[in-house]
A protein has these predicted regions:
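Glycine/Thr-rich phosphate-binding loops of Rossmann-like dinucleotide-binding domains
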Residues: 119-120, 159-160, 182, 227, ...
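A Rossmann-like FAD-binding core segment of flavoenzymes
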Residues: 73-93, 97-98, 103-104, 166-263, ...
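Beta1-alpha1 glycine-rich phosphate/pyrophosphate-binding loop at the start
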Residues: 3, 7-76, 159-184, 255
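FAD-site-proximal beta/loop scaffold in flavoenzymes
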Residues: 6, 121, 127-143, 239-289, ...
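Glycine/small-residue-rich loop that forms an oxyanion/phosphate-binding "nest" at active or ligand-binding sites
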Residues: 80-143, 154
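Conserved phosphate-binding and hydrolysis motifs of nucleotide-dependent enzymes
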Residues: 13-18, 114, 153-155, 277
Length: 310
């Protein structure tokens, strides 16, 4: 590897946003590399079935879609490197990324590092992913049409997920560790009026029950310690997300949740650095919105490079 080589664009993260940015950059003639620590696709690659991404009338699994996105970008000359970014200097000229595979330098940086859903931390949770355990109601809700589901959480995301699921599921059981929702008041009345939404206050999930698939949950009362079993077909874990922004802290503006502050232009507080997909502040985190961000970031990077004469 030539550590002195300067790329036009360094893309950190090989999810749908990252590879879309790389595709657009390569087609614009920008020398581009994608740095991914695991495998292409990010969280999308773990999704068993994606039915809300345009162009696939029968849906597609996340791994296959990720593979297609990577191959499409590489067809136009994008380089993929499997490397973990260990340190970033985003104000250096050129910008510098220290990785497990060496130093990378670039004129611009696109951060597509994503956000991981916070988990319940109970046994079997990982094994039941896609077999009854889900983290995205907008993605997987339709698989539970006419069924009974549990939503875990008490914030805005949990309330919104419960409302969305109440339109398709036979019954929604909202489980929260406190005796009232943390969600903003706008959600309280619609949830209270929904005839198929039931609340389990002062409760946490202590165990997942399953055969080949999830069959129910065991709840523990946080006040009395008593346990009970709830039969259900699915559990939606809506206890927040953890954005992968540790390396950006102190260099970029972050909101109180740790997300990189960036609007629809994807521009961050440092010129030439762009945040796309789940890692940035935004109202909706989906594959299609990450892809849109990737295209926008390249457009803004082209403007930046032209104005800077780079």
């Amino acid at each position: 590897m030539n550590n002195n080589h300067v790329y036009d664009m360094l893309v950190v993260g090989g999810g749908p946003g990252g590879y879309t940015a790389a595709l657009y950059a390569a087609r614009a003639g920008l020398d581009t590399v994608v740095l991914e620590k695991l495998s292409a696709g990010g969280q999308m690659a773990l999704t068993e079935q994606i039915d809300n991404y345009p162009g696939f009338e029968d849906g597609i699994d996340g791994f296959s879609l990720a593979e297609k996105m990577q191959k499409q970008a590489e067809r136009f000359g994008v380089r993929s490197e499997y490397a973990e970014v260990l340190r970033m200097d985003l104000t250096a000229v050129p910008k510098l990324l220290e990785t497990s595979e060496g130093i990378f330098r670039g004129k611009t940086v696109v951060l597509a590092t994503g956000a991981d859903p916070r988990t319940l931390g109970v046994a079997g949770e990982t094994e039941l992913l896609g077999r009854g355990v889900a983290y995205c109601a907008a993605c997987d809700g339709m698989f539970y049409k006419g069924k009974t589901v549990v939503v875990v959480g008490g914030g805005n995301s949990a309330a919104a997920d419960a409302l969305l699921l109440s339109r398709v599921a036979k019954k929604v059981i909202l489980v929260h560790r406190r005796d009232t929702l943390r969600a903003t008041k706008i959600y309280h009345e619609p949830l209270a009026q929904a005839e198929n939404v039931e609340f389990r206050w002062n409760s946490v999930v202590s165990a997942l029950l399953s055969g080949d698939r999830l069959t129910g949950v065991r709840l523990r009362d946080t006040v009395t310690g008593e346990e009970s079993v709830v039969d259900c077909d699915g559990v939606f874990v809506s206890v927040g997300r953890q954005p992968a922004t540790a390396l950006a802290a102190g260099q970029l503006s972050l909101d109180k949740g740790g997300y990189i502050v960036a609007g629809e232009t994807t521009e961050t507080s440092v010129p030439g650095v762009y945040a796309i997909g789940d890692v940035r502040t935004k109202p909706l985190r989906q594959v299609v919105t990450a892809v849109s961000d990737g295209a926008a970031a390249v457009h803004m990077a082209e403007v930046y490079l032209a104005e800077a004469g780079r």
